[in-house]
């Protein structure tokens, strides 16, 4: 089935291409053949346009109200792969149906350039929105009957695309990633560095949206990264378990890598922007990465319940991360100074001093303020006692200062980080932005900060 769901209202409606249930029927007997994981893709150029794939490419421009077939059969249409699944109960749940499309993607840089891949090794391309299709499968040096697991059209060049080919159902567990730079006329295998094992077959390859040549790939047990456009791959795991990586999405606003794994699990690596500079950083004895923009978020208290939460995730650290690379630990340590746009020192932080990539979080606060001391009792509260020194603390919940133990959060604006490593000093500028969910103006926030100081 296929549904359109409105997140604003919670309403859903069925928008399947053809009102025919395939359960119990051999695929060869159906009008359209659908895989259990049939491809669905949104057009990056035309609002409301969506593509889905059976053995054909179907297009809608009205969010599923009507559909148009824009291709011939783009599979081998081998009838021997379209029979009943067998077993005691012939369910035909489309889990193993052959001769179906498995991947559809439209180019992000050239409208109407669409790539398709099938689960029987067929790759097609059209450059006119489906009027004419070219089969480029024969140009790829790959074994027969592979599943074109995903297609990644490049956002830097219309003629370039990447594909991953999954052969494990044919008893071949090797990694297959291919790249073309001429609209599929020629292809190069680019999977060097992914070790061969029974879990090496590739589910997905993804291009970094901001750094040409930086690629990510997911196999059946790991995540890999390439800094040289696929010529060489290296394991990219950290604390991620050896899970089958089925899908990758990069959240471009915060540069977070979202990893979807088999079993409906997902993992998030926060802020992968430093990977775009890593090749240059690794050649230096010390290097400070660009600092991304930070939001002055206000924490939102969740509704308290007694039921245990099954959510294993947690929010990233609050504030702005300062990332730097050290080839070796340095004498004298690392010190970080934060200045505002008036070149006034806001905060001094002590950095970690270990070989490799270091990350220090600035919580967007000034140095701790002086503790307020009230020397009078509150009006009408004669029972309130002073301490031995003759004063009582000001409880500044509304000012978010925690009795003077914290400094106020800075107002939105431009800031500079001076990172002192050994005898070197590096300077990076960055923005602190207002929480878009708050109603206070930047002027009001500035006045509150001045008052808190």
Predicted regions and their residues:
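Extracytoplasmic/secretory ectodomains and luminal regions
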Residues: 279-453
């Amino acid at each position: 089935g296929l549904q359109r769901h409105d997140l604003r209202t919670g309403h859903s409606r069925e928008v399947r291409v053809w009102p025919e249930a395939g359960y119990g029927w051999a695929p060869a007997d159906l009008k359209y053949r659908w895989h259990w994981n049939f491809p669905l893709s949104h057009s990056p150029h035309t609002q409301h346009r969506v593509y889905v794939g059976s053995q054909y490419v179907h297009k809608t421009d009205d969010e599923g109200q009507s559909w148009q077939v824009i291709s011939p059969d783009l599979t081998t249409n081998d009838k021997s792969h379209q029979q009943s699944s067998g077993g005691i109960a012939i369910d035909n749940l489309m889990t193993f149906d052959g001769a179906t499309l498995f991947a559809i993607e439209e180019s992000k840089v050239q409208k109407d350039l669409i790539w398709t891949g099938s689960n029987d090794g067929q790759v097609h391309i059209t450059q006119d929105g489906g009027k004419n299709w070219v089969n480029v499968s024969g140009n790829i040096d790959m074994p027969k009957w592979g599943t074109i697991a995903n297609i990644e059209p490049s956002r830097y060049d219309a003629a370039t695309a990447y594909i991953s080919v999954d052969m494990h159902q044919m008893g071949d567990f090797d990694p297959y990633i291919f790249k073309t730079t001429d609209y599929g006329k020629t292809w190069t295998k680019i999977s060097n560095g992914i070790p061969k094992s029974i879990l090496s077959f590739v589910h997905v390859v993804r291009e970094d949206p901001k750094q040409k040549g930086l690629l990510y790939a997911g196999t059946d047990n790991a995540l890999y990264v390439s800094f040289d456009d696929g010529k060489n791959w290296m394991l990219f795991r950290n604390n991620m378990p050896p899970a089958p990586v089925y899908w990758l999405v990069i959240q471009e606003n915060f540069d977070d890598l979202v990893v979807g794994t088999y079993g409906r699990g997902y993992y998030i690596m926060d802020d992968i922007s430093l990977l775009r500079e890593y090749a240059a950083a690794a050649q230096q004895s010390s290097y400070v990465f660009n600092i991304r923009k930070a939001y002055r978020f206000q924490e939102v208290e969740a509704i308290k319940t007694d039921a245990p939460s099954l959510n294993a995730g947690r929010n990233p650290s609050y504030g702005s991360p300062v990332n730097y690379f050290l080839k070796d630990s340095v004498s004298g340590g690392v010190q970080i100074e934060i200045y505002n746009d008036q070149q006034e020192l806001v905060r001094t932080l002590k950095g970690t001093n270990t070989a490799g990539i270091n990350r220090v979080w600035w919580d967007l606060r000034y140095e701790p303020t002086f503790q307020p001391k009230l020397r009078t009792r509150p009006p009408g509260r004669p029972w309130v006692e002073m301490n031995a020194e003759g004063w009582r603390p000001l409880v500044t919940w509304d000012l978010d200062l925690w009795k003077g133990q914290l400094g106020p959060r800075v107002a939105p604006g431009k800031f500079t980080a001076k990172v002192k490593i050994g005898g070197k000093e590096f300077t990076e500028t960055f923005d602190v932005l207002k929480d878009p969910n708050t109603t206070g103006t930047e002027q009001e926030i500035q006045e509150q900060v001045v008052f808190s100081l």
